[in-house]
Structures are given as C-alpha cells and as structure tokens.
C-alpha cells in the first residue's frame, strides 16, 4: 500500500487506521510512566521481601504479576480520565498534540477508561478483598484527583503525593495479607 493509497483510505473513511488509534492510546495512557512504575513495583517487591523469600520465588509469584498488571491497568485508567477532564484546557494550551476529537473520540476514551477500570478492579479482587478494596479506593482517588483536587493548591499536591505512593502500598498490603512474615520497613 503506497502512501497515497493510505491517505485516500484515511480521507475516504474519515477514520484514522487502527494502528494510529493504538499509538494515540499509548500516548494517552503514558506507557513510559506505567513501565517505570511497574519496574519500581517489581524492584520494591524483590527488596522488601529479600529477608523472607528468595528473589527467584518473588519473581515466580503469580500473584505479584497479577497485582502489578492490575495496578498498571488502574494507572492507565487514571491517565485516561485525567486527559478526559483536561480536554478543553489542552485544546487551548496545545491544540496540535490533543488526541481527542482528531485521532480518538471522547467516547472511545471513556469506553477505554471503563474497560481498564474493570480489568484492573477484577484482577485486584482476585487477590483478596483487602487488596481489591484498596485498589478500588486507589482508582476512586485517581478519579477524584482528576475531577476535583488537581485545581486546588494544597490538596492537589497532597493528593498527587498519596496517589504516587499508593501502588507500592498495594503491593505491601498484598504481601502482608498472603505471607506469614511481616514485611520489614
């Protein structure tokens, strides 16, 4: 397919190709931040538990992987809802990089938010009610932060700080729930 065929197909359908939507979605969920947080979660798990479990056993723990994937989905949902509430401001401040309306619709983003929230919450509940409840509170906190807190001077910074630490607290809570050993501080 030549570039002119690609342009004709794009203009004829008035819809961007699916891979363009996928790239826009990856940009919207800030995949590089999610990758950084997941790496931090794995490293903190290994070093938090180093006195109680061999590193290989920590890495082999399927529940750790489920929790990290659940947290990653919830973080991506948080980025989507944050971008949704920032839509009007982004159109004014930097319209050339706004993906809503041009590449992906607001409805698609809301549907993606609900999907990511559902997957993250479902995986969290599989790990136990305490982790499920904590991660549900975390995802609610992300929504409250995006919708209300971010504009407020002191509560916005405090909320962002708490939400930054919350995924690591979820990992700690998971291991306190499933191990007979206390986690060293």
Indicate residue ranges for each PLM-predicted region.
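Multi-pass alpha-helical membrane architecture of UbiA-family
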Residues: 1-185
């Amino acid at each position: 397919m030549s570039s002119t065929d690609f342009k004709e197909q794009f203009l004829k359908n008035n819809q961007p190709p699916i891979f363009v939507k996928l790239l826009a979605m990856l940009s919207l969920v800030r995949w590089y931040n999610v990758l950084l947080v997941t790496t931090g979660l794995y490293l903190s798990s290994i070093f938090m538990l180093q006195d109680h479990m061999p590193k290989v056993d920590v890495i082999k723990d399927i529940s750790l992987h489920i929790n990290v994937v659940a947290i990653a989905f919830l973080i991506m949902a948080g980025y989507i809802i944050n971008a949704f509430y920032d839509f009007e401001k982004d159109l004014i401040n930097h319209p050339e990089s706004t993906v809503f309306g041009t590449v992906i619709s607001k409805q698609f983003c809301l549907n993606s938010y609900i999907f990511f929230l559902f997957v993250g919450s479902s995986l969290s509940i599989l790990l136990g009610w305490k982790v499920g409840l904590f991660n549900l509170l975390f995802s609610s906190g992300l929504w409250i932060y995006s919708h209300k807190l971010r504009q407020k001077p002191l509560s916005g910074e405090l909320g962002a700080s708490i939400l930054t630490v919350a995924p690591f607290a979820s990992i700690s809570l998971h291991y306190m729930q499933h191990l007979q050993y206390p986690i060293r501080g």
